[in-house]
């Protein structure tokens, strides 16, 4: 994938990003053979899906970003390759958390913090400026389990499908951006 062709990425260090993406792909291939972390077929397409949000939302003021159910790192690992924010990844699955820790070391990402626990069990010392999640659960339960990380200024950015419209019933103050079948939902 040629990232330099995308206007929304022009202000980022794409050489460094592409080096980290290469490391990511190698590690994922290695871990997937043993631990079956993900069934995704088109990794490049999912990487693009992870960073396309930068075309719709400005992350520059976010100091702390929490990701719920980080799995194999989509979407926030790729944002962490580009942004200086502190990324807090909550992944209770030991194999997936081990993969994320290895990735942090191999890609030299001091801004990545991995928690091998459910977010609702975390005794936090920070409030997230942004909370992200990719297709983990419906919106309302997600808002509930994240209550210990959020305050009145926290923004939720969710990678969802077309079902998002039903999930947002009785919820106000949101925006949805569409890219093919993906719905990027920003809840304020």
From Swiss-Prot:
UniProt keyword Cytoplasm present: yes
Catalytic class of the enzyme: transferase
Pfam families (UniProt xref): GidB
GO molecular-function term, one example from the UniProt record: rRNA (guanine-N7-)-methyltransferase activity
Protein name, per record: Ribosomal RNA small subunit methyltransferase G
Protein task: Specifically methylates the N7 position of guanine in position 527 of 16S rRNA.
Family statement drawn from the similarity comment of this UniProt entry: Belongs to the methyltransferase superfamily. RNA methyltransferase RsmG family.
Catalytic activity: guanosine(527) in 16S rRNA + S-adenosyl-L-methionine = N(7)-methylguanosine(527) in 16S rRNA + S-adenosyl-L-homocysteine
Organism of provenance: Campylobacter jejuni subsp. jejuni serotype O:2 (strain ATCC 700819 / NCTC 11168)
PANTHER family: S-ADENOSYL-L-METHIONINE-DEPENDENT METHYLTRANSFERASES SUPERFAMILY PROTEIN
EC number(s) stated in the UniProt entry for this protein: 2.1.1.170
Keyword terms of this UniProt record: Cytoplasm, Methyltransferase, rRNA processing, S-adenosyl-L-methionine, Transferase
Keyword S-adenosyl-L-methionine: yes
GO cellular component, one term: cytosol
Family matches, as SUPFAM superfamilies: S-adenosyl-L-methionine-dependent methyltransferases
Cellular localisation: Cytoplasm
Residues annotated as binding S-adenosyl-L-methionine: 69, 74, 119-120, 134
């Amino acid at each position: 994938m040629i990232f330099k062709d995308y206007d929304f990425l022009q202000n980022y260090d794409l050489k460094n990003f592409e080096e980290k993406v290469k490391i990511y792909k190698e590690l994922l291939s290695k871990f997937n053979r043993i631990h079956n972390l993900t069934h995704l077929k088109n990794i490049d397409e999912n990487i693009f899906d992870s960073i396309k949000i930068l075309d719709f939302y400005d992350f520059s003021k976010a100091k702390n970003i929490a990701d719920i159910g980080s799995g194999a790192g989509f979407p926030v690992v790729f944002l962490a390759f580009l942004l200086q924010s502190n990324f807090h990844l909550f992944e209770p699955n030991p194999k997936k958390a081990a993969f994320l820790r290895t990735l942090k070391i191999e890609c030299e990402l001091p801004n990545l913090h991995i928690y091998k626990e459910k977010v609702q069990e975390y005794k936090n010392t920070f409030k997230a400026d942004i909370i992200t999640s990719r297709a983990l659960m419906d919106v309302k339960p997600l808002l509930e389990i994240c209550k210990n990380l959020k305050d009145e200024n926290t923004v939720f950015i969710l990678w969802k499908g077309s079902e998002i419209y039903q999930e947002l019933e009785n919820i106000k103050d949101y925006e949805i951006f569409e890219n093919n079948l993906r719905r990027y939902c920003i809840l304020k």
